[in-house]
Regions:
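Residue-level recognition of specific faces of alpha-helices
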Residues: 56, 70, 216-219, 226-229, ...
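Thr-Gly-centered strand-to-loop micro-motif
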Residues: 42-44, 69-70, 186, 200, ...
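Acidic, Mg2+-coordinating active-site environments of NTP-dependent enzymes
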Residues: 10, 90-237, 262
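Active-site beta-alpha connecting loops in nucleotide-dependent enzymes
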Residues: 223-225, 242-266
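Buried hydrophobic packing segments
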Residues: 28, 32, 56-57, 196-206, ...
């Protein structure tokens, strides 16, 4: 049996990608909370498969003003199936990297599968992805005639970000439609700034103000096991990145550690 979401007149946002799905989804949930308060439905944890997604959507009620769902995959056809169920208004692909190669065979196959989320968009939906990504041409072809809202750190997109860091402190400046704002981020690393910029793009495509985007990103406190900061003994700082890993996410975590000052232990 197949559940298809229809007749829902609220923003229904979706996120997929090799890395950063859950972090981006939680950032978006925080942004939506800034705009809509408690009237937001979001995927719990990473319940992002063919069981978790329908369970999340079955929780939609008349009290909700927006929803954000996460979609994961480990074999061909899974994202297309999930997108066909949700029919989101706005969809984000965070990236396509070396994850689930055992089921997909190549990064190109992963990128193509991730991009099928755009084919499941509603007719007036918007695709969001990074204009700096090597798979931008592939994803643009999968979007077809639907709208896009690309983001970039190089300035070649409607939404432009600038990242700066000092030790484990980081900030993201956003420029969009003649407005600009800077926010402090709870998570270190340029990859997390990219997650935040993508989440901002989804929110802006859904009609949320840049002020609410900034408020939501500022309120975001991080996700368990994903570069969470803890106090250690003797003034040490422990970065917990133990949730899950693939080669690219491990490298991103090592890059964060390498950029810090003082003695370091991996």
């Amino acid at each position: 049996h197949r559940l298809t979401v229809s007749g829902i007149d609220i923003p229904l946002l979706a996120v997929t990608g090799s890395n950063g799905k859950t972090t981006s989804k939680e950032m978006l949930a925080s942004i939506l909370a800034a705009a809509y308060g408690d009237a937001v439905l979001a995927t719990r944890g990473n319940l992002n498969n063919d069981i978790g997604l329908p369970l999340t959507l079955l929780g939609l009620g008349s009290e909700h003003q927006a929803a954000i769902v996460e979609m994961g995959m480990n074999h061909p056809g899974e994202i297309a199936y999930l997108a066909g169920i949700a029919r989101p208004n706005v969809a984000l692909v965070t990236n396509a990297l070396r994850a689930h190669l055992e089921g997909m065979g190549s990064v190109e196959a992963i990128a193509r599968e991730k991009g099928t989320i755009f084919e499941g968009l509603s007719e007036d939906g918007t695709a969001v992805f990074c204009a700096d990504d090597p798979w931008v041409g592939l994803w643009q072809s999968q979007v077809g005639m639907r709208r896009t809202l690309c983001f970039s750190f190089s300035g070649q997109a409607p939404l432009v970000g600038a990242y700066r860091a000092h030790g484990l402190e980081s900030w993201l400046a956003l420029q969009y439609a003649g407005e600009s704002i800077e926010v402090a981020l709870a998570l270190p690393g340029e990859h997390n700034a990219r997650n935040a910029l993508g989440a901002a793009g989804v929110a802006l495509a859904a009609g949320i103000s840049l002020a609410d985007v900034a408020a939501g990103l500022s309120a975001f406190k991080g996700v368990k096991g994903r570069l969470q900061r803890h106090a250690g003994f003797g003034g040490a700082v422990v970065l917990d990145d133990t949730y899950n890993a693939n080669p690219d996410s491990v490298r991103a975590a090592i890059d964060v550690l390498a950029a810090t000052v003082g003695n370091k232990v991996l």
